[in-house]
């Protein structure tokens, strides 16, 4: 059911229909299934679009615990409860973290951005380029443009465009040269 219902939660979220998103999510819970991080993230996004701060942060705390529990349940038994996050699970919180950073910074909760970023970092999770972009936007909103520019310059990867590297540039829908008709 989750594969059917999670996209519906996301669709309602994008339209700002938080009550409808809640109803669909409740239908998922009524099936007896434990909602995945994907489903929880869809609901988190609905709360973000609705501007419901209490709901965003309550659900974020739950998402964070679920991610930690997921990592611990798949960790080797010998590694213990405080085992580091496995490499293949380090990105579990990337999307929900971006949602929380965006919401907190747009709400003027700049200290909360730092708090949640550090919480995720201490737990051993990784950040993706979207997280870093959201952090840059949050820093700019907090009037910390210099820090945002430092992240852009030193953290975000910069791959020059093909034309700058002397590579041939082709139209977006053109076939690659090796497969072009002769």
Question: Residue ranges of each PLM-predicted region?
Answer:
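A basic, Ser/Thr-enriched alpha-helical scaffold prevalent
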Residues: 1-182
């Amino acid at each position: 059911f989750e594969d059917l219902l999670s996209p519906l939660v996301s669709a309602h979220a994008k339209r700002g229909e938080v009550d409808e998103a809640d109803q669909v999510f409740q239908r998922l819970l009524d099936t007896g299934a434990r909602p995945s991080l994907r489903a929880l993230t869809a609901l988190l996004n609905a709360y973000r679009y609705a501007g419901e701060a209490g709901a965003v942060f309550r659900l974020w705390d739950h998402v964070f615990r679920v991610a930690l529990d997921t990592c611990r349940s798949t960790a080797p038994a010998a590694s213990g409860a405080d085992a580091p996050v496995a490499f293949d699970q380090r990105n579990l919180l990337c999307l929900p973290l971006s949602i929380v950073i965006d919401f907190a910074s747009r709400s003027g909760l700049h200290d909360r951005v730092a708090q949640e970023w550090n919480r995720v970092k201490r737990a051993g999770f990784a950040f993706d380029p979207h997280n870093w972009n959201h952090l840059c936007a949050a820093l700019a909103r907090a009037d910390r443009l210099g820090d945002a520019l430092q992240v852009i310059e030193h953290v975000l990867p910069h791959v020059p465009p093909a034309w700058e590297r002397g590579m041939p540039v082709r139209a977006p829908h053109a076939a690659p040269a090796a497969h072009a008709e002769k």
